[in-house]
Amino acid sequence: MKTELTLLEQTLTLHRFPKRNNETLQAWDAGDEYLIQHVEQLALPESSHIVIINDHFGTLSCWFSQKHKVSMMSDSYIAHQATQANLQQNQRPPVQLLTTLDPVPNDASVVLLQLPKSNRHLVWILSQLRKALSPNIPIIAVNKAKEIHTSTLNLFEKHLGPTTTSLAWKKHRLVFSSATVNPANEVNPECGWSIEPYAITLTNLPNVYSGESLDLGSRFILEHLPADPTLEDFIDLGCGNGVLSVRLGQLNPQAKITCVDESFMAIASAQKNLHDNLGKRDIHCIANNCLDGFPAHSSSMIVCNPPFHQQQTITDHIAWQMFCDSKHVLKKGGKLWVIGNRHLGYDVKLARLFGKSHVRVIANNSKFVILQAIKS
């Protein structure tokens, strides 16, 4: 796996986060290279303020921080950690780390944007750029050419202003725009709905998974979550909007609740949803990489709906890390509940970790399976 990016007679050593042995995926892509080469051709004055949005593992921040002031905005805790680690690895100056809920710096010289997967997140980002920037500030986005649709460009036109694209290079394309549309379109970051028959109301911020309705996996596990008067606490790992925590909290009013996700918007959404649905409870919502820093043998129950993407890449290492971390953090006799697509084979992974006799199927249907693993 390649860890050295050499471009324009410079070399950076870059790693994904968390750093893993036998890593097969590199920390940058051709889109990063295309942006770097294009911006270098602009010959920006030194100490220009470059605002970078969605710098997945800090490649752009590392490159431009040597000569410029850099602010990196991302909804991803892991992207923040990766950026800091790669800056240190390459002995580069620190950058300002912001979330995409923070105001866009209004003194930017140029904005570089890795297009997000979610259109709701993109619309939110574009609306905030329009609000913060003057019309002469270039906004340059990048993505794989096949992911830049006419509908994508229409969103730029609607929320920013006139928009053009580059030629494709290594299957990537640049998008050029500026904040000229007048008047600016107001965008509400929140989207809400109710879930029957559970008397649950949910509010989602723009980058939260399944942003405008309840996903089928969550709906299935809601039917089976347990009420247990002896349950002292539980962790919702990869909590998203916190819907599983809300339901478990309804069923177990005595339990302390901890929600963990790597998305800052997910954590903010979960915090609001728990407060709105459960009132004053012992609740902690934490942006984190899985269960990093959680003490061993400290939790009675963990519920987990693992993602199988990291940024744009399909991978199962996040689920594996979640399962390993859960085993470490669970008390003896503690339970891990997992919901997943049947074809992902989580039962095999859990049997490897917990022992085959300690893993059982709680429920399944044609698409999903709910598994329980008990720590012995």
From Swiss-Prot:
Enzyme kind, highest EC tier: transferase
GO MF, any single term: nucleic acid binding
Biological processes, Gene Ontology terms: rRNA base methylation
PANTHER family listed in its UniProt record: RIBOSOMAL RNA LARGE SUBUNIT METHYLTRANSFERASE G, RIBOSOMAL RNA SMALL SUBUNIT METHYLTRANSFERASE C
GO cellular component labels: cytoplasm
Catalytic activity, EC: 2.1.1.174
HAMAP family assigned: 23SrRNA_methyltr_G (MF_01859)
Lineage: Bacteria, Pseudomonadati, Pseudomonadota, Gammaproteobacteria, Vibrionales
Encoding gene, per UniProt annotation: rlmG
Pfam family, one: MTS
Reactions that this protein is recorded to catalyse: guanosine(1835) in 23S rRNA + S-adenosyl-L-methionine = N(2)-methylguanosine(1835) in 23S rRNA + S-adenosyl-L-homocysteine + H(+)
Protein name (database record): Ribosomal RNA large subunit methyltransferase G
InterPro entries on file: DNA_methylase_N6_adenine_CS (IPR002052), rRNA_m2G-MeTrfase_RlmG (IPR017237), RsmC/RlmG (IPR046977), SAM-dependent_MTases_sf (IPR029063), Small_mtfrase_dom (IPR007848)
Signal peptide residue numbers: none
Family: Belongs to the methyltransferase superfamily. RlmG family.
Key words of the record: Cytoplasm, Methyltransferase, rRNA processing, S-adenosyl-L-methionine, Transferase
Main location class: cytoplasm
Naturally occurring in which organism (per UniProt): Vibrio cholerae serotype O1 (strain ATCC 39315 / El Tor Inaba N16961)
